[in-house]
């Protein structure tokens, strides 16, 4: 289970000020950060046990992407939104991230998400099928833990569970083939990058 201690945010994504700032930075080497983050997402999407995101508040940009990398999502019923707002802030969505959205979201939700930066409420995300359960604010994490406990038996054979994940999500029925999101996330540098705005 991935959860946040912040009552308002699950994850607000990347620190854009840090990513776009010039010169050396105490936060580390920004040149490798994008590819390393994508590899982390690739690891989670194929993790050999069931994974649940306890989305207790807003999940924007890479925070939305992180939530989608989990097998299931429990989201707060009354507040919080999921949104890929890159187009609004002038940041292109890399092909690997587009592949993840394409494979994890229903077709109508994919286009609304990436082209129009739709802000999905919990109710809308649940109705669209990419959130599996809604909960009140003080129950999001406990409901996610309950769901994880229910699904934990499926991770008893980790090798099989991982293999199954790798063969579900790709458009060619194998997540790690060259058009599958896990392969693209892991090898993000091999794909064309969209133009930078500004």
List each model region and its residues.
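C-terminal long alpha-helix characteristic of the crotonase
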Residues: 75-80, 126-179
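Hydrophobic/aromatic residues within transmembrane alpha-helices
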Residues: 2, 15, 66-68, 125, ...
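CoA-thioester-processing core
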Residues: 40, 44, 54, 60-113, ...
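A short acidic, glycine-rich active-site loop
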Residues: 21-35
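A structural preference for short, pocket-lining loop segments at secondary-structure junctions
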Residues: 1-25, 42-53, 72, 76-80
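Glycine-rich phosphate-binding loop at the start of an alpha helix
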Residues: 13, 31-38, 61-62, 119, ...
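Short, active-site-adjacent cap segments at secondary-structure transitions
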Residues: 7-11, 60-61, 168
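Well-ordered beta-strand positions
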Residues: 72, 112, 116-118, 124, ...
């Amino acid at each position: 289970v991935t959860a946040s201690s912040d009552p308002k945010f699950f994850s607000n994504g990347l620190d854009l000020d840090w990513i776009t700032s010039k010169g050396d930075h105490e936060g580390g080497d920004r040149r490798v950060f994008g590819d390393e983050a994508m590899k982390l997402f690739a690891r989670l999407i194929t993790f050999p046990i069931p994974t649940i995101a306890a989305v207790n508040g807003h999940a924007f940009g890479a925070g939305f992407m992180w939530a989608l990398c989990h097998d299931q999502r429990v989201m707060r019923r009354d507040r919080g939104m999921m949104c890929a707002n890159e187009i609004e802030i002038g940041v292109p969505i890399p092909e690997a991230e587009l592949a993840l959205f394409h494979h994890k979201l229903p077709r109508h939700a994919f286009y609304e998400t990436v082209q129009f930066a739709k802000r999905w409420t919990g109710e809308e995300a649940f109705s669209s099928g990419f959130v599996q359960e809604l909960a009140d604010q003080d129950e999001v994490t406990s409901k996610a833990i309950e769901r994880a406990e229910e699904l934990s038996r499926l991770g008893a054979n980790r090798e099989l569970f991982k293999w199954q994940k790798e063969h579900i999500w790709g458009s060619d029925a194998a997540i790690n083939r060259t058009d599958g999101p896990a392969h693209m996330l892991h090898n993000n540098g091999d794909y064309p990058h969209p133009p930078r705005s500004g």
